[in-house]
């Protein structure tokens, strides 16, 4: 049964919510607003006060009604007798009419004058809200507004009745009247941070799994370490063997669960790593024993220290002949990470992620550190947490990977996620299994929200869908206003900078990516490129395939488009060719940064250029033993040649890039198949072809220097 709120209780007793709030405050009960739920003991106390008063009022009104009815009965009897007397007196009254008229004139002059109302007493204490006006403050003090205006004038402040007062002025005026003032703290329900509370003091809080972030320099073995822990292989599926997105996984060790956030290690993902440190309880710093401390290692240390998160150092690759764990320990002491063996407090675990040696020791250390931290959460509370990743899926719509930090998340919950909202339609765990509930420290992917949130946004569950909609829409509108204000400010700032620097050149960039985290990280990396005389200006970022709107914007702003793991649709391709807009498509983030930086320095001297020669649509698939998947295709653009490179595109996102294995027309091998013809295609080392996929053929053409 849901608890009764203050306004509902007031409505039941036909009272104002303010009366109930005032009474609760007199009982020393903290009240935020009329939406606050009442406990059973609070309702009983209020019943004693207000229902007793109402009984007395009802009793008094009943007595008055009895008295009134008795008086009416007596009056009826008296009226009969008075009729006779009136008839007799009428004759005498006619003679007195003149005298009465004269008396009325005299009485008008002799009427007692209305006495002025007694002045209201000035209260000893008043409360006020930020932005209170002169008129409102005068009403609280029970004085005329003109009095306040005079006092302000004497203080050298010219104000009118609608002028807002600051804290200092309010205190000066109140002091003049001998009144104590206190500012009311107004709780803004749109601020999601107010729903995040420390659960250590909650008597109902129970132990929760630790959230662990793996950090370190690129290629030091972070993903391999996580794979070794989960007994899975993720690295092989990543472009260039490097983790591109934050993944959240949960494992069980000695009966206790541990949640891992796999944060990419390259400097380009600084923003993602910083976000990981904000939600984590323990940081695993992976350092290769044969490589030592590198720039991203230092960056990871700084992020963990800033978030005040305990660090466990995993010295990886100890099985290599060139490994030197002692050198790693020595180098890390310069950054305040002193091993326990050397009298410090930092735990060092030597291990090999590839062979699995030392993994059990690492998990044991994580358990010990988590035990000392006393990590707790209350699964009975409303669910709150953070967005790990978000993307737009063509079939499922907007989806978000969430980490539940407190409470329990359920399918069907009304939820506000950042500046968007919705009702959870489906929930999937890290193993891809559909689940109905998710407790604290559990990573899940949800669908049912109406827009793609930002990675790192907070989410809060509300019991009322209307409230969630109202808060979500309000936050969305506020974010639009803020973006407009920021864009105006940035424009003015840029104009001033241009005036100072003279002929300043801007490189306008539009970034489109497959997931929000990659887009954010790429934008942050490009903004850090420091080339004298040229500034990178990110004019638009979004998730999804490159479309005609992006090309139009790039053309209007004289900018370039960077596609990260996405492809342009056919309309965007035609528009880019017609408008001569430069589109750069990449799958590995290093190449983007290197290419842009080289171009800005004037050092870019490409030897080869990719040229798309055709596209074919997969109409039907056939699985043949010892051959694999054969795709029955229809060439929609250009031509498909046997020696061309190919990439598989699904919903605008690149799924695979490789080589053609076979190209056939009916049962015969073909060197090329032109537009408008059907063909059979098999892809080398790839069988996950589906109907509707687009096979794009390309060639590398040498560019003359």
Curated annotation (Swiss-Prot):
Record region (Disordered): 40-124
Pfam families linked: EF-G_D2, GTP_EFTU, IF-2, IF2_N
InterPro entries in the cross-refs: EF-G-like_DII, IF2_II, IF2_N, P-loop_NTPase, Small_GTP-bd, T_Tr_GTP-bd_dom, TF_IF2_bacterial-like, TIF_IF2
Region (G3): 262-265
Region entry G4, spans: 316-319
Biased composition (Basic residues): 94-108
Family annotation (SUPFAM superfamilies): Initiation factor IF2/eIF5b, domain 3, P-loop containing nucleoside triphosphate hydrolases, Translation proteins
Cellular component annotations (GO), alphabetically ordered: cytoplasm; cytosol
PROSITE patterns in UniProt: G_TR_2, IF2
Chain residue ranges for the region called G2: 241-245
Binding site for GTP: 216-223, 262-266, 316-319
Keywords: Cytoplasm, GTP-binding, Initiation factor, Nucleotide-binding, Protein biosynthesis
GO biological process: translational initiation
NCBIfam families, per the entry: IF-2, small_GTP
Family of this protein: Belongs to the TRAFAC class translation factor GTPase superfamily. Classic translation factor GTPase family. IF-2 subfamily.
Name of the protein described by the UniProt record: Translation initiation factor IF-2
Organism: Staphylococcus aureus (strain NCTC 8325 / PS 47)
């Amino acid at each position: 049964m849901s608890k009764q709120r203050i306004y509902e209780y007031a409505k039941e007793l036909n009272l104002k919510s303010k009366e109930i709030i005032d009474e609760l405050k007199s009982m020393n009960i903290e009240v935020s607003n009329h939406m606050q739920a009442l406990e059973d003991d609070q309702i009983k106390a209020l019943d004693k006060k207000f229902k007793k008063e109402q009984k007395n009022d009802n009793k008094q009104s009943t007595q008055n009604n009895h008295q009134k009815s008795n008086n009416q009965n007596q009056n009826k009897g008296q009226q009969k007798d008075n009729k006779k007397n009136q008839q007799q007196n009428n004759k005498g009254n006619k003679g007195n009419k003149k005298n009465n008229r004269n008396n009325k004139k005299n009485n008008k002059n002799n009427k007692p004058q209305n006495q002025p109302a007694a002045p209201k007493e000035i209260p000893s204490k008043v409360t006020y809200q930020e932005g209170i006006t002169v008129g409102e403050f005068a009403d609280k003090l029970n004085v005329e507004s003109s009095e306040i205006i005079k006092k302000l004038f004497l203080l050298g402040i010219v104000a009118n009745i609608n002028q807002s007062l600051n804290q200092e002025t309010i205190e000066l005026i109140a002091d003049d009247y001998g009144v104590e003032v206190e500012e009311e703290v107004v709780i803004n329900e749109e601020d999601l941070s107010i729903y995040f509370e420390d659960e250590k003091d909650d008597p109902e809080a129970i132990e929760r799994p630790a959230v662990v972030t793996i950090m370190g320099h690129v290629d030091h073995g972070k993903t391999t370490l996580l794979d070794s822990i989960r007994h899975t292989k993720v690295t092989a599926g990543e472009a260039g063997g490097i983790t591109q997105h934050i993944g959240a996984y949960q494992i069980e060790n000695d009966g206790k669960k541990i949640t891992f956030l796999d944060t990419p290690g390259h400097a380009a993902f600084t923003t993602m790593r910083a976000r990981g440190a904000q939600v984590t309880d323990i940081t695993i710093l992976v350092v290769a024993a044969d490589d030592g401390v590198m720039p991203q290692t230092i960056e990871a240390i700084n992020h963990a220290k800033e978030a005040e998160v305990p660090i466990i150092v995993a010295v990886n690759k100890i099985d290599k002949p060139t490994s030197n764990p002692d050198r790693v320990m020595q180098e890390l002491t310069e950054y305040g990470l002193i091993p326990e063996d050397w009298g410090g407090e930092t735990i060092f675990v030597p291990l090999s992620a590839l062979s699995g040696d030392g993994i059990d020791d690492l998990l044991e250390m994580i358990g010990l550190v988590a035990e000392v931290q006393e990590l707790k959460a209350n699964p009975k509370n409303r669910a709150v947490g953070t967005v790990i990743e978000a993307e737009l899926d063509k079939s499922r719509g907007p989806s978000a990977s969430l980490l539940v930090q407190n409470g329990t998340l359920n399918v069907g919950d009304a939820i506000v996620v950042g500046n968007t909202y919705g009702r959870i339609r489906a929930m999937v765990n890290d193993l891809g299994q559909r689940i109905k509930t998710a407790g604290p420290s559990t990573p899940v992917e949800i669908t049912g929200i109406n827009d793609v949130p930002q990675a790192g946004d907070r989410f809060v569950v509300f019991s009322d869908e209307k409230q969630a909609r109202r808060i979500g829409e309000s936050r969305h509108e506020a974010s639009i206003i803020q973006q407009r204000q920021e864009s105006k400010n940035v424009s003015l700032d840029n104009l001033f900078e241009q005036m100072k620097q003279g002929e300043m050149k801007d490189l306008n960039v539009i970034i489109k990516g497959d997931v929000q985290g990659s887009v954010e990280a790429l934008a942050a990396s490009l903004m850090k490129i420091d080339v004298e005389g040229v500034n990178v200006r990110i004019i638009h970022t979004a998730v999804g395939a490159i479309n005609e709107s992006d090309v139009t914007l790039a053309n209007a702003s004289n900018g370039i488009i960077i596609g990260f793991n996405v492809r342009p649709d056919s309309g965007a391709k035609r528009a880019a060719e017609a408008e001569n807009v430069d589109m750069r498509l990449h799958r590995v983030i290093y190449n983007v940064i290197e290419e842009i930086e080289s171009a800005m320095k004037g050092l870019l001297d490409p030897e080869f250029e990719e040229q798309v020669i055709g596209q074919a649509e997969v109409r039907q698939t056939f699985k043949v033993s010892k051959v694999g998947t054969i795709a029955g295709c229809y060439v929609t653009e250009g031509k498909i040649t046997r020696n061309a490179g190919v990439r598989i595109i699904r919903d605008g996102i690149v799924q695979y890039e490789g080589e053609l294995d076979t190209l056939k027309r009916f049962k015969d091998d073909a060197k090329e198949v032109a537009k408008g013809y059907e063909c059979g295609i098999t892809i080398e080392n790839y069988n996950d072809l589906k109907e509707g996929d687009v096979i794009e053929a390309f060639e590398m053409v040498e560019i003359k220097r």
